[in-house]
Amino acid sequence: MGFLKKLILFSLFLFFIACNKGINNEFEYIEISRENYTNKLHGFWLGQSIANWTSLITEMDKIGNIGEIKTGNFYTRDDWGGIDQRSIWEDSLVNKSRVKIDFVLKDESDIWGSDDDTDIEYMYQYLLNFNDTSILSPNQIRDGWLKHIKSNEENYLWESNQVAFDLMKSGMKPPETGDPINNNSYMMIDAQLTTEIFGLLSPSRPDIGLKMAELPIKTTARYEAQEIAEFYVIMHSLASNSKEFNSTKENIFWIAKESREHLNDNNYPAKMYDFTEKLYKSGINWENARDSIYQRYQVDQKDGYNITSKNLYCNGCFAAGIN
């Protein structure tokens, strides 16, 4: 049975089980249109691909002014459409005169390239179908990684993903591959980029999404990085909620608020969320909000976010929190 058919059946299954007893002991059912949800899944992959390739233009251009690598002021809206500046990885001989900061789009007949975030999500989608399961086992994850990820060639894995992959090659299985004892990159961004899809595979049931995503998240993350990844699984699950909203903005804010409830108030993800929300409500523009976040967390290291003190390459620019 094809994956899409299974997903449709799963959505129908949720129609019967995703319910709560109301005041009168009556069940409230969640009904999801198969056609509409298929279109939304298409939008997920398309939007993610456009965002990936558009952001790659400016990736690593601006990482702040702390440590050995300093890149000057951050970009602003005035830079959109202008010439892309050199990243910290690019040789000075690279000609940037024709590289503009703009959307990257492709024709419907083209094939999108990718890196580890979308690749691994696509792999997890495949492994669920291949193994005919909704909960992947440690062996299934390890075998899938070793089969589908290049070992000796460039595989475009970064940070915790690469460490976990190396550990798998040595015989280790998840969740040990994400344990801080074995993986010193457990606090990086990897898990939140590679497990959002489990929220989409559990529409309007974040509790199911978290169960499906638990081991994949722990494959590369722990503590706050794990919590942030779970936050995004919940958001993606709630994106298919059946509530009525006056606008997309109202819908997104509701999703964010509901997902915020999962965050521990004492940890930096919750404090970062609250600080960013406060900045938004203050009415300042996004450039000033971005600069305020940089100052508070990367310069001043507030709310327990101490990545800068670890003296990591590019000041921990791939860390889960600041991203």
Model features per residue range: what roles?
Residues 57-103, 118-120, 142, 153:
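Active-site-surrounding "flap" and adjacent substrate/cofactor-binding loops of secreted or lumenal enzymes
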Residues 4-10:
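Sec-dependent signal peptide recognition
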Residues 32, 165-186, 195-205, 214-219, ...:
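Accessory "access/gating" subregions that flank catalytic or transport cores
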Residues 46, 110-116, 120, 125-230:
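Active-site cavity-forming subdomains of large catalytic enzyme subunits
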Residues 48, 52-59, 197-200:
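Alpha-helical support elements that line or immediately flank enzyme active sites
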Residues 98, 102-114, 118, 124-153, ...:
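N-terminal leader/propeptide and maturation segments of large enzyme subunits in energy/redox metabolism
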Residues 17-18:
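C-terminal motif of bacterial Sec signal peptides marking the signal peptidase cleavage site
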Residues 36-52:
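Mature N-terminal segment immediately following signal peptide/propeptide cleavage
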